[in-house]
Amino acid sequence: MNYKQSSPEVLRQLIRDGELVGHTSGMAEGYIQANVVILPSKYAYDFLKFCFRNPKTCPLLDVSEVGAHSFPYYGPYADIRTDVPKYRIYEHGQLIKEVDDITDLYTEDMVSFLIGCSFTFEHALLEAGLPVRHIEEGHNVPMYRTNIPAESSGYFKGNITVSMRPMTMTQAIKATEITSHFKNVHGTPIHIGTPEELGITDIDKPDYGEAVTIKPNEMPVFWGCGVTPQSVALDAKPELMITHSPGHMFITDIKDSELND
């Protein structure tokens, strides 16, 4: 099956049925993919403020009604409890397990957040002839925790996370131009080259995802990453926090051209 050309609705059904379990990079070309954070309602306002204060890493797309399973605009026929290939369950800041269905954990008190994902702009990079190495190599995108603090909000504080795509400087400049039109899905890079300035000591050992080849004439190009809330959860320690597993996104019904400004 050609996942690249498949519709979001078809892919979500495959995920719901347990037939699609891997990362979603390169799927549903032209449609927005989203990071997912699900919290008890008492944490929702603080997290909403956290997103607004950190738009490069947590560009907020939508927030559900309390207890709702879907999103009227981004996925009216979706079910947030089943339509992500893999979820992470955090309790009091500790990663407890990964599951492929959260129906038994989701209560009428939960609020779901959709946060923009850089997978959304990857097809634009490819169309411009720019490399997206993790797609070339069939990997999940490499992601790294940094030493850069996020702007805190109530319970939520900690350092930001970044994703990385290797490019030449000429390609990085072109990628910056292209991604400047995708402000709702992380926008332009936050750093180019010198990973040690971000506190990254070994570029070949990402904290999430998989390492990719960096050629001799290339440098790492870093974008803000929606995995940031998972890092922040280690400090916030909410009694329960459910997220997507890194790289395993929620595929929305909205085309990226609707956000491309």
From Swiss-Prot:
InterPro entries linked to this entry: D-Glu_cyclase (IPR009906), Putative_hydro-lyase (IPR038021), UPF0317 (IPR016938)
Presence of keyword S-adenosyl-L-methionine: no
Enzyme Commission number, as recorded: 4.2.1.-
UniProt keywords, alphabetically: Lyase
GO molecular function (one): lyase activity
Keyword Lyase: yes
SUPFAM superfamilies given in the database record: PSTPO5379-like
NCBIfam families referenced in this protein's UniProt entry, alphabetically: PRK05463.1
Family: Belongs to the D-glutamate cyclase family.
Name of the protein in its database record: Putative hydro-lyase SH0274
Organism: Staphylococcus haemolyticus (strain JCSC1435)
High-level lineage: Bacteria, Bacillati, Bacillota, Bacilli, Bacillales
